[in-house]
Amino acid sequence: MFLFRVFRSSRTAIILLLCFLVSPCLQAQSPSHYEPSLESLDKHPLPQWYADAKLGIFIHWGLYSVPGWAPLIHPEHDFTSPDYITHNPYAEWYLNSMRLEGAPTKAYHREHYGADYDYYNFAPVFNREIQKWNPDTWAKIFHDAGAKYVVLTTKHHDGFTLWPSLTPNPKLAAERQHATRDLVGELTAAVGKQGLRMGLYYSGGYDWTFVPGPIRVPADYEAVKPQSEAYGKYADAHMRELIERYHPAVLWNDIDYPKSGHPLQIMAEYYNTVPDGVIDDRFGVKHSDFISPEYVTLDKISPTKWEECRGLGRSFGYNRAEGEAETIAPADLIYLLVDIVSKNGNLLLDVGPEADGTIPPVQMDRLLALGAWLQMNGDAIYGTRPWKRAAGETAEGIPVRFTEKDSAVYATLLGQPKTTGITLKSLSLKVGSQIYLLGQATPLSWSQQGDAIKVSLPATLPGRYANVLKVIGPLS
């Protein structure tokens, strides 16, 4: 993944500004044909499936999964830190990190593989390991976790592709260019059988086989973007292959797109091939269907659809150094999803498999917890829209997040009540309205007390992490 370029102090303000600049017209009818112009592309409406989905699974898998290591120095992704690049916690940046003097990854590589061991020697190892992989197993796991779509890295910054591309890489030996199995095609088929949609990530802005770098300082982020005519044609050809062969529901580019390429043409061809597809905001042009903050949650409801991408841990790619302490806790993961959805967002939650496709046990634990919670409480998530405000609080100090769907408002408690009653502050409800607890069929007793609603709860609550009140009636 890209190191998100907006410093933490100003990220949210810039992201919210982008909401207005890139907002697609949600009421517009889909044109029968798109042209490679912003005027035409901006007529693309946000598909209802994407607005309803709320949860996707991101997968970072490639040569970097073989060493599968990054340092754990920066727990909060402090991109402004002077040593962030040399101590990059993203394991998928292994190739860059192993070439930096003073980088822990360089020392790790020297110790485990030798100083002269070429990164692309991992290709035959990866291709041997992927023979153990079962795409149907992944698809079932993602379905049971509650995801509605999946996004796979088809080519990351190292240039290695997860499909047998018909466009050869002039910088790499044939046996080191791509996976020997069509991982993209196989997972697309498996995901479809589970009723999920398949999206594809492509690193258009970086390809370290064309411009190796390395990236040592922030100024290098732009300098290492390949802009040659040859690379523009190469990226365009890859994009066309992915669109024509796999019809991805999400076209997820990263790090901008080469100026020598034709992003507007690619977008038009994509919409004409997949009319209900969506495009992210990382092509470097002023069109997208959603914005994509990385490890950042917006502070308020956004008028534009947005999708937070983040790993279950600090890395997107597999990092064998990560464990419980570096992995988001089940409760925090559920609270994060609820918070994002209340503000008109989706969560694109990343898993980092080992080279053979094994999902680390600590990540499996989180997926199972999330899936179990969604099985009971999914009505408050899927197909909902933000209510008139995202956040509230009980008189007892429990944070609340609101969503709505049809005639119901859902109030999700981000914490466990310590008594058999809670008071929802600054809310009023008309007599005759009903309040239910998701997971139970009997309505709850409630009363209006001034500008607050007091709700009686059962002694035993059905939810382990976050319980949801379903309010049927005019809530204000």
Where are these regions (language model features)?
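Generic alpha-helix initiation/capping and coil-helix boundary signal
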Residues: 6, 15-16, 49
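Generic signature of intrinsically disordered, low-complexity, basic-rich segments
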Residues: 8-9, 24, 407
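Bacterial N-terminal signal peptides
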Residues: 13-24
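Mature catalytic domains of secreted/periplasmic carbohydrate-active enzymes
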Residues: 29-476
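N-terminal secretory signal peptides that target proteins for export/translocation
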Residues: 1-9
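Intrinsically disordered, low-complexity peptide-like regions
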Residues: 12-13, 297
